[in-house]
């Protein structure tokens, strides 16, 4: 169990979750998200900011029945995981770009474009995907880039084919990347800004790392119980050995006393 937990803790997720905080997009942020993000980026200690649909640690939406350019066969439908994100999502989480480009405001509306992960390109058997199209939900979208695989669920789940679309209006979770060592000051600055938009709503930010740790609560409890039971077993074993040697020593003492009474020499007692 400890080896499993060590593997989970040390495994490369495909992105950097350190010092990423998240909180819900609610209140006035629903209509003024872009303004909030732009202001947040000016706060000392904020390295980048974006938003996404749901928790990065547990993207679970699935869809089937999509078609794409150069599709070999339509007999076996591929299950895709999909997520709606905002600009700067990949930059905020340091997700490596493999080919093409990420979503950018310089290109205007990106609602008809899409980005795939490596797994999606693999199962689609698509060579040189950038510039080709995929039909999602009745709309033909241009593939503008591909990103390296990253874990968006528990480590017990295999990485699935994934597509990412840029629809800021449909995101509901704000992500902010904070410079290490400035957490307290930066969080205070973010809360102050948040209160300017939502004075009556509590600022409830949490670290993304905590979301991932929450995926393994059961394993941690089992590991803790195993530790306690192992300690108890060792103590019981030691007590057993102590009792055994005490009994053996007492028995040997009685034997030596009897042999001395019967006239045994010191040499006889030793050998």
Where are these regions (language model features)?
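Alpha-helical transmembrane segments
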Residues: 1-17
